[in-house]
A protein has these predicted regions:
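Signature of N-terminal electron-transfer/Fe-S-associated modules in redox systems
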Residues: 1-158
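Single conserved hydrophobic/aromatic residue that forms the stacking wall/gate
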Residues: 156, 162-172
């Protein structure tokens, strides 16, 4: 049975979309309806990761965060979940999330087009894991491509210490 609405959490606000278009991609919804343009469109095929967003879902009384390619995911997938986009990571007082801070500190991007996707993939990994490892970090960005450097600059973030020693905002 098709629902006549989609209900999800964005920041601390419950959003209800009445009669959602089941063919509208999350990328299109985020950029046109929410008017948030940090999430980028690269390949439109789910291969580059520029459009990566994070969905939070309650599973066995624990929120699990999943990096999702928004260009190949559709609005109905939001139902009952939390949507986190790159614009949501900065705290209310303007402090960067540790992943964003590490990107700045270690010069993790060149032109910046792919940066939001890398940040969201790393954010998902960061939220789901208390212990970070080099393998976990590299695995988390394996679905993201950088056309400028071939992702070489992002591999400078290999050290779990790079992410865990970056400033942690009080609300993250």
């Amino acid at each position: 049975m098709i629902s006549d609405s989609v209900k999800f959490l964005l920041n601390d606000k419950i959003i209800v979309i009445k009669n959602p278009d089941p063919n509208q991609t999350l990328l299109n919804y985020i950029r046109t309806e929410l008017k948030k343009t940090g999430t980028k469109e690269g390949c439109s095929e789910g291969g580059c990761g520029a459009c990566t967003i994070v969905l939070g879902e309650l599973v066995a009384n624990k929120i699990i965060y999943k990096a999702v390619n928004s260009c190949i995911s559709f609005v109905p997938i939001l139902n009952g979940k939390q949507l986190i986009i790159v614009e949501d990571l900065v705290s209310k007082n303007g402090q960067l999330h540790p992943v964003q801070h590490a990107m700045v500190k270690f010069h993790g991007s060149q032109c910046g087009f792919c940066t939001p996707g890398f940040v969201m993939s790393l954010f998902s990994m960061f939220k789901n894991n208390k212990k970070l490892s080099n393998e976990l970090i590299i695995d988390s960005i394996s679905g993201n491509l950088c056309r400028c450097t071939g992702s070489v600059s992002y591999t400078h973030l290999r050290s779990p210490r790079d992410l865990s020693t970056s400033r942690m905002p009080s609300s993250a």
